[in-house]
Amino acid sequence: MKKMGVALLGLLLLVVFAGAAEAEIKIGVLAKRGPEKAMADWKATGDYLTAKLGEPVVILPLKFVDIEPMVKGGGIDFMLANSAFYVEMEKKYGVKAVATLINSRDGKPLKEFGGVVLVRADSPIQTLADLKGKKFMCVKYSSFGGAQMAWRLLLENGINPQQDFAVFAEGGKHDNVVLAVKNKVMDAGTVRSDTLERMAAEGKINMADFRIIHQVKDDFPFVHSTILYPEWPMAAVAHVEAGKAARLGAALQALTSTDPAAKNAELVGWSSPADYSQVRECLHAINYGAFAK
């Protein structure tokens, strides 16, 4: 009887701990600059949401290739990923945006971002047309700011990245692309806006060592080559109850710029979900993924 009692107690504890694990709210975050950077940026957001919602919220840094399997399999409850991932997961699996992040630059709110086409400052490449036959690196073909925005721009200017480059490589992380261009491994590359400025602020590069191809001159505070698109959304996976999704979205939108969660992620805060129709148009234009003809 004693052994049976111990066994039953063990089973009960297993059930309790399993239930506790299931009760966690799991947010999958696209780790565009690696898992350590993702945790440094977003762990405080998990802590903030835990306090606001009264439920444990955990941050799971994910590689580009991990996002779709985790959404499809229900391994995460919410996803924070680039805008293209969002519209694809929306179309295929019914994820729903609950908030859109508002980036920060010198305290100014930025709800959009763009793509940057960069070369070394001493490169003979001057125009998009000059990129034909050159070695070009993107972050991942699935990276919106680090590939797909520039891909659309190139197609609109008569260059097919899949046919017209000597090499069309993936760097895996934004920093890798910048360093590959800096070290002459690649002739040119593309990353999302604010990558160069952040790397310069971290002492990894000097902005003067690079030149921007097809630079757009406007009041946006980061260099960019493409039109601007809405920032990353936080999205609820289809299995999440609507009330819980709404509460998490409201909690994010209540975040102030002085909170550690905002400071660590370099955000002003969060807004209601943006209009992502321009993102869908981009994926249609490059004939990509769920939007391929």
Identify the residue ranges that each predicted region occupies.
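Short helices/loops that flank or line small-molecule/ion binding pockets
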Residues: 60, 65-83, 88, 92-93, ...
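Bilobed "Venus flytrap"/periplasmic-binding protein-like clamshell domains
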Residues: 26-50, 110-178, 194, 262, ...
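Extracytoplasmic small-molecule ligand-binding "clamshell" domains
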Residues: 23-87
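Bacterial N-terminal signal peptides that target proteins for export
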Residues: 1-9
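Bacterial N-terminal signal peptides
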Residues: 8-16
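An extracytoplasmic/periplasmic, membrane-proximal ligand-sensing/linker region
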Residues: 25-44, 50, 195, 219-231, ...
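Pocket-lining segment of extracytoplasmic ligand-binding domains
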Residues: 135-137, 141-240
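A structural signal for short loop-to-beta-strand junctions that line the ligand-binding cleft
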Residues: 95-110, 223-225
